[in-house]
C-alpha cells in the first residue's frame, strides 16, 4: 500500500457487501486483542446488520483508500452518555496490512469534521485500551485531550482499562489531517 501522505483516504456509508471486511476485522484474535477477543460469526452478522442501518444516533462508515476506493476498515460515531451528558463516541479499526500509514487518523478526522458540522454535541469521546498505543496516538494526533483513565465494559461482560479521550467539537479546528 502507498504512504498515506499521498494515498487518498475517504469514507463511505457501510453496505451489505462489507460483511467480509467486518469478519476480517472482528473475527481476528490479533485485531481484537484490546477488545475482549474475536466476536462470534453470529455477533458479527448482527453487528453488520446494525452498521447497514444508519440512524441519527449511530453511523458507521467503511474506510476506503486509493483511486479504486478499496475498503480497509471502519470508522463510526454513536451517541453515548458520559457522566450524565449526551456526547458522541467514536471508534475505528483498520486491517493490519493498512495500519501504520495514517489511514485510521485521516478517516477519523473526516468523521470529526462531520460531527463538528452537525453541531449536535459539544464533545466527542474515544475510549481506546490503555495498552493500545496506536489508537491512543490517533487521539493525540487529532487533538483529543486525555480526560481520565478508567474501567469500561466492552464487550458486555468484559471490563477493560481504557483512556477517556475527549475533543471539544466547538473549539477552533487544529490541522489534524496533515
Descriptions of predicted regions:
Residues 1-27, 34, 60, 64-178:
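Acyl-donor (CoA/ACP) binding surface of acyl/acetyltransferases
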Residues 30-50:
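Conserved GNAT-fold acetyl-CoA-binding loop/helix
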Residues 39-41, 50-52, 89-91, 165:
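Short, charged/polar low-complexity linear motifs in solvent-exposed/disordered segments
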Residues 41-45, 53-55, 66, 94:
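Juxtamembrane/interface motifs at transmembrane-helix termini
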Residues 50-62:
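A short helix-loop-beta-strand connector motif used in the catalytic cores of GNAT acetyltransferases and
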Amino acid at each position: 500500500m502507498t504512504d498515506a501522505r499521498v494515498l487518498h483516504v475517504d469514507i463511505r456509508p457501510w453496505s451489505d457487501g462489507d460483511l467480509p471486511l467486518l469478519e476480517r476485522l472482528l473475527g481476528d484474535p490479533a485485531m481484537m486483542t484490546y477488545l475482549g477477543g474475536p466476536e462470534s460469526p453470529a455477533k458479527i452478522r448482527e453487528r453488520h446488520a446494525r452498521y447497514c442501518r444508519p440512524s441519527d444516533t449511530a453511523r458507521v462508515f467503511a474506510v476506503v483508500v486509493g483511486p479504486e476506493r478499496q475498503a480497509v476498515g471502519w470508522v463510526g460515531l454513536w451517541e453515548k452518555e458520559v457522566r450524565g451528558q449526551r456526547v458522541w463516541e467514536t471508534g475505528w479499526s483498520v486491517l493490519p496490512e493498512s495500519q501504520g500509514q495514517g489511514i485510521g487518523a485521516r478517516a477519523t478526522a473526516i468523521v470529526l469534521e462531520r460531527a463538528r458540522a452537525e453541531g449536535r454535541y459539544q464533545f466527542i469521546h474515544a475510549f481506546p485500551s490503555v495498552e493500545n498505543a496506536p489508537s491512543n496516538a490517533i487521539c493525540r494526533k487529532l487533538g483529543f485531550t486525555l480526560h481520565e483513565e478508567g474501567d469500561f465494559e466492552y464487550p458486555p461482560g468484559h471490563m477493560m482499562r481504557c483512556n477517556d479521550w475527549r475533543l471539544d467539537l466547538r473549539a477552533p479546528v487544529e490541522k489534524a489531517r496533515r
